[in-house]
Amino acid sequence: MLPSTIQTLTLFLTSGGVLLSLYVSASLSYLLYSDILLKFSTTKITAPTMSLDCANISNVQAVNRSATKEMTFLLPEPEWTYPRLSCQGSTFQKALLISPHRFGEARGNSAPLIIREPFIACGPKECKHFALTHYAAQPGGYYNGTRKDRNKLRHLISVKLGKIPTVENSIFHMAAWSGSACHDGREWTYIGVDGPDSNALIKIKYGEAYTDTYHSYANNILRTQESACNCIGGDCYLMITDGSASGISKCRFLKIREGRIIKEIFPTGRVEHTEECTCGFASNKTIECACRDNSYTAKRPFVKLNVETDTAEIRLMCTETYLDTPRPDDGSITGPCESNGDKGLGGIKGGFVHQRMASKIGRWYSRTMSKTERMGMELYVKYDGDPWTDSDALAPSGVMVSMKEPGWYSFGFEIKDKKCDVPCIGIEMVHDGGKETWHSAATAIYCLMGSGQLLWDTVTGVDMAL
């Protein structure tokens, strides 16, 4: 009798051969979208050659001596991502702390990288924790200069969310002292900016390929948002700005598809200074961004970008809860919504994320607890309304970082569950050792989950004197 493996081949692979086609039918159900076409790609699988040199050759006359056959499968391509309704919940809770320098005694490949400007971006299957490193680790001998924003050594790196950004764990994507990244459902788009202040360059990487560039237009520190860009239907939108840190800096948006710039968008409205925007989808039609004005006001410039018309407008947030740092007392700025008020010089990137519900929308924001220093971080929310015209105070929703702990940049992102999106806010907690020692950051993460009240704040647990 033939061996069982040869019996199987006898049944399915005759001398004429059989083409096996597997048709996969899939339905991607988005709560905000329908009629999404599922495309297919052809995959060929070749079975290994099996020699049939048996003792009794008469037993195998019906079987070809070579059993190599090609089987063609029609497999679904990954689909473009679209915003969906948020997962259920009414409060944020402490989700995760990434505090690399708690492991600062490790050396070699296990040493934590010295980083700043962390942010998180998510694809359908994973989230990545990004940051800008100084190409140095702690402990190490290259601490000098790690407090500077821009130099020739800085790189955009990432690890899988939940991993510690060590030398060994980190992927180095490109040289960059400003960065962003996003996933379109099929592939990652990475953004890095570096070069001299007077002629910086945006570089785009799609998957593993470097695909496009964009040159400085004001010759004054071209830079991007330091948080995730936003993709819908294969189009990804990136905020950039170029101009003085204490004067005019007009932003633009780049529309990017598969790693290549296909359109520039020039916002209208209150455009004097807009930088470091944190952006997300209010709906399948509109991207909204809460940004930083480092020159004129402690109010946040608020962008509405229509992805159907590729137009954008900027106005100041009207709320009496001022979100920048430094800032005046809440409610102290008089006049119309576009009034700048005082204490507008200087600023900080702010956290912002949407909670999309069937009957309403929630907008969640973060700001430092201190009005003058980068200390502490508190969460606020406002349901429905228009940030351009609503002057009401935002509702405080809990302390994420106490006044005793550093609260620097913050950002928003969304984790993709099976049928909904989970809104989250991340907080950069900087270990500021001054110019003489290392200068790096931990990341605290809070996400929408369950009900009740936000229960506990985050500490880094790092003592720089150790």
Curated annotation (Swiss-Prot):
N-glycosylated. GO terms for cellular component: host cell plasma membrane; membrane; virion membrane. The chain crosses the membrane at residues 9-31. Residues 13-35 are annotated as: Involved in apical transport and lipid raft association. Inhibited by the neuraminidase inhibitors zanamivir (Relenza) and oseltamivir (Tamiflu). These drugs interfere with the release of progeny virus from infected cells and are effective against all influenza strains. Resistance to neuraminidase inhibitors is quite rare. Residues 32-466 are virion surface. GO terms for molecular function: exo-alpha-sialidase activity; metal ion binding. It is an enzyme of class 3 (hydrolase). Substrate binds at residues 116, 150, 275-276, 292, 374. Residues 1-8 are intravirion. Its EC number is 3.2.1.18. Its main location: virion. The active site is at residues 149, 409. CDD domains: Influenza_NA. Its cofactor is Ca(2+). Belongs to the glycosyl hydrolase 34 family. The influenza B genome consist of 8 RNA segments. Genetic variation of hemagglutinin and/or neuraminidase genes results in the emergence of new influenza strains. The mechanism of variation can be the result of point mutations or the result of genetic reassortment between segments of two different strains. This is Neuraminidase.
